[in-house]
Structure formats: structure tokens, C-alpha cells
A protein has these predicted regions:
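Long, hydrophobic alpha-helical segments that serve as membrane-spanning/inserting helices
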Residues: 1-170
Length: 170
């Protein structure tokens, strides 16, 4: 995102058309992979009341914190989707969708560079400002997601260790 923003805000963004368009397509897409919790066991523990049967407070606390952070992460994905939608609206004022269309194959993969004569739509400084703001928002949520996914992994690893020790598991 930083490189894309740098090129778009350079004195001569047309010099970077071939580099900008592929990035601009990818920014407007949702991630093809995400952390999707398989939380059937967790839901069963909570809904059946079995979570209260666990006597070890460290285990209950760790399970609860992990579950809260999983729900938080799923909420952040919704925020990210919203940010992507706002980006698309701003990008539609700057980029030529026909150029995007020529760059992708039947699987929606970016396979070609834009044509040599490709350009941007005429846009105002205000429209570029809006686009920059949307890039800023996406950058922020991407950083937050990476931070929180690392925390979630650390929590999951810690929870597994607590369970192994507390219940003598291998």
C-alpha cells in the first residue's frame, strides 16, 4: 500500500501506470484466505454450560480470553470489508475499469500489464485525497489484523500448553 500511495502521489503518476494498476486491482479485493475458527467445540462448551464444569481457573480464563479475541478478529474482518468497499468507491473515480478488465483472465487473476497507452480517469485533488484516506484506512486495518492474529496465535499456543500441563496431554 505504501508503494502504491507513493506512486499515485508522485509529481508524475502517469510514469508509473504499469506498476500502479496491478496494485490498484489487488487492493480492492478481499483476501482469499482468512482465519476462520472451527469453533463447534467452543460453542458446545458455552451453550451446554459445560465450561463451568472446568475446575482449573487458568484454563477457563485462557479459553474465555481466546474466544473473546476470536470474536474480535471476526469483527475486524467486517471492518476490513467495509474499508475495501469504500476504497472501491474512491478508486472508481480515478482508475479505468476497462484497463482492469483487460489485465485479468477468466479466473480473475492479474495476468497482464496495462497497455502502454493506459491512463487514469481525470480526477481532482479532492478525489485523490479521498483515495489516499481509503488507502490509509486499509493500511491501518491490515496492521491491526496482523498484530491481532499474532496475539491470537500466541494465545492459542499458550492455551494448548495450559491444557497439556493441566490434563497431562501429549
Amino acid at each position: 500500500l505504501d508503494s502504491l500511495s507513493f506512486m499515485m502521489n508522485s509529481p508524475r503518476p502517469l510514469d508509473f501506470v504499469k506498476q500502479i494498476y496491478p496494485y490498484a486491482i489487488l487492493v480492492g479485493r478481499t483476501l482469499p484466505y482468512r482465519f476462520i475458527p472451527n469453533d463447534g467445540t467452543m460453542q458446545q462448551l458455552k451453550n451446554s454450560g459445560a465450561l463451568r464444569l472446568i475446575r482449573n481457573p487458568a484454563v477457563v480464563d485462557s479459553i474465555s480470553k481466546y474466544d473473546i479475541n476470536v470474536r474480535n478478529m471476526l469483527g475486524q474482518y467486517a471492518v476490513e470489508e467495509n474499508q475495501i468497499e469504500h476504497y472501491r468507491t474512491a478508486a472508481a473515480k480515478i482508475f479505468d475499469a476497462l484497463v482492469f478488465s483487460q489485465m485479468i483472465d477468466e479466473n480473475a487473476s492479474v495476468v497482464r500489464s496495462p497497455a502502454d497507452n493506459s491512463s487514469f480517469q481525470s480526477y481532482t485533488k479532492r478525489e485523490l485525497y479521498e483515495w489516499n484516506y481509503r488507502i490509509y484506512g486499509l493500511s491501518g486495518i491490515n496492521k491491526a489484523n496482523r498484530r491481532d492474529l499474532r496475539l491470537l496465535l500466541k494465545q492459542a499456543t499458550g492455551l494448548l500448553e495450559i491444557l497439556k500441563k493441566g490434563y497431562h496431554l501429549e
